[in-house]
Amino acid sequence: MAGVSPVVNHPYTTNSGDFIELGMEPAQKVQVDLDEAFNQMLHDGKVEEVVEAINGSPDLLSESDVENAKNNEHTYDIDNKNFNFEPKNSVNKTETIREELDQAASKILIETLDLHQKEGFEETIVTEEATDAVDLEAKGTTHGENDLDEVPTELNELANEVVDVDDVVSPSSELNAQSVNNILPISDDPKDSTSEAETRDFNWLSKGIVIFPNSSECAFYGNNNDEGMYLYSNGDDLNENTIEDFFGLVRARLESLNLLDSDSELLCEFPDLSLKINEDNVYASQIHLVDILEILTVHCDLEESFSIVFSTQPRFIARYNELVQAVSSSSNSEIDEVEDAETIDSKILEKRNDLNNEEPNSVVAEDGSEIITLDENDQSPNEATEKLRDNDLEESLIKDENLEDVEDENVKLDNYNIDGSLNNADLSQEPITNDGENVDWEATSEDVLERGYESAFPESEGTINSSKRRLSVTTDTENIELSDELASAGTPKKSKLMPSDD
């Protein structure tokens, strides 16, 4: 075929999910092959100029050629351009024009190229049509016999032979009344319209080997290797599937076999390309599987099989959460240990308070003395002895204070009546106060009261003072016991039934 360039194959073009190999050709100009009969009719110089304009640019005619071609009132469609011819005389010779046009009919070879864009891929349709006859219907009114010889039949024929490219390529478009008839229809299916470009269904994809950690259990093949289950079939659209979708298919298969849990992620490796990508990689949703296959076609031989190796590893987020939980649990255990220690200390203090409040067990000896006995949970012998010594000292102090108070009270009562008045029976005696001073008996009882009623009745003051002394002694004793217990709390406990080393 003249003027047809060699076809360039592209293996990644699909139609309805099928992979095909397309032919790529540059656009060709419309060529008109004139036969000898047509050449003999080129006798008019003006017509030759029109023919040269058509051969140079079939889409454009100059205005001068149009003016020179106006010889009849017939209207012809030449590449969507109207040329009106106004004859001098109107004679109806339609049959004569039809006969002359039939004699001048020639064989026309039309080669067209239409590029269609479908789903991001180019589809090439190469059309080769041959017509044996061209039947044109003349439009218009009558022509005159005298002016029929002046009508350039060559121009009329050329005007009907030029066909719009869009009308030939697009099968769905309707040809107008002036279009060429008997044009072979063009199919929408590129397999039917493409003769030179061979189709390929990418059978080499079935040569891909998917290797899993345990291929015997999770292989994608049944008992018969010839009839296996594949991740993708020829009808699947690989252009729309990303690596993330590929991971999803593999995960669904492995989870159905109970071979993969949510704490593990898949790791996909292409050994032929030295590429690895994990399931949680952000680029997995941006790279399409067909991109990897295109790289394989360049770097690998299609006659050899390629492999995809899958493995598993702990997910980053799962392992991270596990470590955080371990650190949190260890911190909680340390807090629990501190709380347990504080609880033990509080229990020790409560026990000490209970021991301080308890009265020691006592036994009366034969001589009437009181002996304090110790239980297993009581204080040590040293502490008990010290406490007993403090108790004896306190009792002796209390006795002395009570004796002094009784003597003072007896002296006071001897000098005063019950109502506080001086005893008149003793006025002859020399009044002596507690301090040894002389008393003026002429002083009234009111003067005595002014000196202080408390000095006359000092028993209340002595009672208060003795109570203060007893309280101070008791407080000091408790402080000594508490300090001894705190000092012994930090040392290992010893059996209280065994004598100490001290």
From Swiss-Prot:
Q: Where is the composition biased (Polar residues)?
A: 420-436, 462-477
Positions of the UniProt region annotated as Disordered: 353-391, 420-440, 454-502
Q: What Pfam family does this protein match (any one)?
A: DUF2420
Chain intervals with Acidic residues compositional bias: 367-378
> Mind telling me which InterPro entries this protein's record contains?
UPF0646 (IPR018822)
Q: Name one GO cellular component term.
A: nucleus
Q: Which keywords appear in this protein's UniProt record, sorted alphabetically? A: Cytoplasm, Meiosis, Nucleus, Phosphoprotein
Origin: domain of life: Eukaryota
Locations listed in the record? Cytoplasm; Nucleus
**GO biological process assignments:** meiotic cell cycle
Just give the chief location class.
cytoplasm
Q: Where in the sequence is Phosphoserine found?
A: S328, S330, S331
The record's similarity note reads:
Belongs to the RMR1 family.
Q: Describe the function of this protein.
A: Required for normal levels of gene conversion events during meiosis.
Name used for this protein in its record: Reduced meiotic recombination protein C1442.04c
